[in-house]
Amino acid sequence: MSDLFRMEERRQMPILPTEPARKEGDGGGPQKPDVKRPDTSDLLRRMKRVDPDAARRYRQRSGE
């Protein structure tokens, strides 16, 4: 009866590293541009120039 419940051992797979094997500073690929987030007041001012109604709707939606 104990032979019915005998299970095979699971095969252990090798654990892969969590980070890819890259050299730091190789400089071969594209890099993220260094830009800061725009100021919201500047954004509203530019939106008013382009479309005043869109600026009003954005102001209501964002709570400003």
From Swiss-Prot:
Region (Disordered): 1-64
Single GO MF annotation: protein tag activity
Tree of life domain: Bacteria
Protein name (record): Prokaryotic ubiquitin-like protein UBact
A Pfam family assignment: UBact
Keywords tagged on the record: Isopeptide bond, Ubl conjugation pathway
Stretches with biased composition (Basic and acidic residues): 1-12, 33-64
Function: May function as a protein modifier covalently attached to lysine residues of substrate proteins. This may serve to target the modified proteins for degradation by proteasomes.
Similarity comment: Belongs to the ubiquitin-like protein UBact family.
Covalent link location (Isoglutamyl lysine isopeptide (Glu-Lys) (interchain with K-? in acceptor proteins)): E64
NCBIfam families: ubiq_like_UBact (NF033388)
InterPro entries linked: UBact
